[in-house]
C-alpha cells in the first residue's frame, strides 16, 4: 500500500533522470542500466527521508491484540495477559453474571510541548466464566506488564435430575 503512493514519483524520477530511457529508438546499453540503478537509489533515499520525517510524529500502538494465556489447575483457573505500558490505574476488572470484563485504556496528550501528539492504547476482553468459579474471591495482580487474574474454583454439586411429566 505504501508503494502505491510513490508510483507517480517513481515514474517521474526514472523518466527525468535519463530522458533516453523513454526513447524506444535508442539502443539499450550498460549506461542505461547504470542510470536506472542511480535513479532507483535516489528514489529509495527520498522515500527513506520522507519516512524518517514522519517516524516519530505519529505515535501508535502496533498490536492487534493482547497476548493471553488461560491455565487450568485443580483449585483455580489463571488468566495471564501481557499488557506492556499499562499500570493498575489504566486497567479495570469487573464481574457481571457469568462474565469477566477486563478493560485497559491509556490516553496521553503530550503536554510537554505545544505539539498535537496524542496516543490512545486500549483493549477490551470479555471472558465467560465456568460454573465452578468462585466469583467472590477473584483476585488480580500486575507486575512488569503482566496481568495475572486468579479465579478460585469451588465444588459444584450436581443437582438431581427432575423428570418433567408430559401433559
Curated annotation (Swiss-Prot):
Identify the PROSITE patterns for this entry: SHSP
Entry keywords, A to Z:
Stress response
Domain sHSP stretches: 59-167
Gene Ontology BP annotations: response to heat
Signal in keyword set: no
Please name the InterPro entries in this protein's record.
A-crystallin/Hsp20_dom, HSP20-like_chaperone, HSP21-like
Q: Give the domain of life.
A: Bacteria
* Gene3D superfamilies the record matches: 2.60.40.790
Q: Which family does it belong to?
A: Belongs to the small heat shock protein (HSP20) family.
Q: What is this protein called?
A: Small heat shock protein C1
- Source species of the chain: Rickettsia bellii (strain RML369-C)
At the highest ranks, the source species' classification is: Bacteria, Pseudomonadati, Pseudomonadota, Alphaproteobacteria, Rickettsiales
Amino acid at each position: 500500500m505504501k508503494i502505491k503512493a510513490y508510483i507517480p514519483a517513481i515514474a517521474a524520477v526514472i523518466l527525468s533522470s535519463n530522458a533516453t530511457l523513454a526513447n524506444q529508438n535508442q539502443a539499450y546499453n550498460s549506461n542505461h542500466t547504470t542510470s536506472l540503478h542511480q535513479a532507483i537509489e535516489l528514489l529509495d533515499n527520498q522515500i527513506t527521508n520522507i519516512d524518517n520525517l514522519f517516524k516519530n510524529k505519529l505515535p501508535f500502538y502496533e498490536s492487534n491484540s493482547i497476548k493471553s494465556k488461560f491455565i487450568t489447575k485443580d483449585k483455580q483457573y489463571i488468566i495471564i495477559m501481557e499488557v506492556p505500558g499499562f499500570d493498575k490505574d489504566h486497567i479495570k476488572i469487573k464481574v457481571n453474571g457469568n462474565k469477566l470484563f477486563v478493560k485497559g485504556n491509556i490516553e496521553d496528550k503530550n503536554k510537554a510541548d505545544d505539539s498535537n501528539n496524542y496516543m490512545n492504547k486500549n483493549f477490551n476482553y470479555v471472558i465467560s466464566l465456568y460454573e465452578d468459579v468462585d466469583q467472590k474471591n477473584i483476585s488480580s495482580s500486575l507486575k512488569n506488564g503482566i496481568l495475572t487474574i486468579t479465579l478460585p474454583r469451588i465444588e459444584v454439586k450436581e443437582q438431581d435430575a427432575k423428570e418433567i411429566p408430559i401433559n
